Amino acid sequence: MAALGGDGFRLLSVSRPERQPESAALGGPGPGLCCWVSVFSCLSLACSYVGSLYVWKSELPRDHPAVIKRRFTSVLVVSSLSPLCVLLWRELTGIQPGTSLLTLMGFRLEGIFPAALLPLLLTMILFLGPLMQLSMDCPCDLADGLKVVLAPRSWARCLTDMRWLRNQVIAPLTEELVFRACMLPMLAPCTGLGPAVFTCPLFFGVAHFHHIFEQLRFRQSSVGSIFLSAGHLIGPVLCHSFCNYMGFPAVCAALEHPQRRPLLAGYALGVGLFLLLLQPLTDPKLYGSLPLCVLLERAGDSEAPLCS
């Protein structure tokens, strides 16, 4: 999200420094070949993720519990092996990240609490209108609703619901691991931070094109810039899960709602507060040092706005 506000606007126009990249200085492949390796690696990950969903031949619909369980197995295997693609990319390009692989992919403790809470809070602010709409249409009051949400029985029921596990846990975790944590470190040295944010959704789109043949459904936009700003995987996963739960805002229903005036005011207020809080809540200083900045410095790009 930092790509949309403050210094993040400059991400889109990051100029490539003239300093020679470390990979070239060490006799590794040139920038052009490095980019081809990065793109091919990302495309391979996307195809592997999608291909794993169709290893199991079945005539059952995608929401059938048996199909969901099989796909759980497939995507968990691919996601577990995806860091090996980053290791192979590192060997082929000669770029040394300067941090451990897990740290580069967003598995780190420094700044983990703000990285988990602030991006989710910002996303919930953006969805202020839909949250108000959900509250207005709920037959129970706030106190009863909180009791249901906090009840252990409700969570136990969710954990046995295969569709809930897919939409709220497995899909956000595996997709963000593959399409954010693995792809962004490979793309950033080639394209720069800003273009990498908008390149990842292309591979994400390849991975979800198959849904056209199964079911037309809304997919939330990329949260890759959260990963860039915070350097943590947990923020994108939580935001992804929240967006899956909320779905696409029912704007048409809001226009016809009996309380449409306060509801539309909530929509407008949510967007306004989101734009107002975007830059301060995605300031990288809140989340500690960014592993991607170390990677870019090693690759010859230490002048990226987020790293300056």
From Swiss-Prot:
Q: What is this protein called?
A: CAAX prenyl protease 2
Q: Which Gene Ontology terms describe the biological processes this protein takes part in?
A: CAAX-box protein processing
EC number(s) on file: 3.4.26.1
Which protein family is named in the record? Belongs to the peptidase U48 family.
Q: How does it sit in the membrane?
A: Multi-pass membrane protein
Which domain of life does this protein belong to? Eukaryota
Q: What is its main location?
A: endoplasmic reticulum
The taxonomic lineage of its organism, from the top, reads: Eukaryota, Metazoa, Chordata, Craniata, Vertebrata
PTMs per UniProt = Ubiquitinated. Undergoes 'Lys-48'- and 'Lys-63'-linked ubiquitination. 'Lys-48' ubiquitination induces its degradation. Deubiquitinated by USP17L2/USP17 that cleaves 'Lys-63'-linked ubiquitin chains.
From the Swiss-Prot or TrEMBL record, state where the protein is found. Answer: Endoplasmic reticulum membrane
Q: Which residues carry this modification: N-acetylalanine?
A: A2
UniProt keyword Cytoplasm present = no
Per its database record, what is this protein's job?
Answer: Protease involved in the processing of a variety of prenylated proteins containing the C-terminal CAAX motif, where C is a cysteine modified with an isoprenoid lipid, A is an aliphatic amino acid and X is any C-terminal amino acid. Proteolytically removes the C-terminal three residues of farnesylated and geranylated proteins, leaving the prenylated cysteine as the new C-terminus. Is able to process K-Ras, N-Ras, H-Ras, RAP1B and G-gamma-1.
Per its record, the protein catalyses: Hydrolyzes the peptide bond -P2-(S-farnesyl or geranylgeranyl)C-P1'-P2'-P3'-COOH where P1' and P2' are amino acids with aliphatic sidechains and P3' is any C-terminal residue
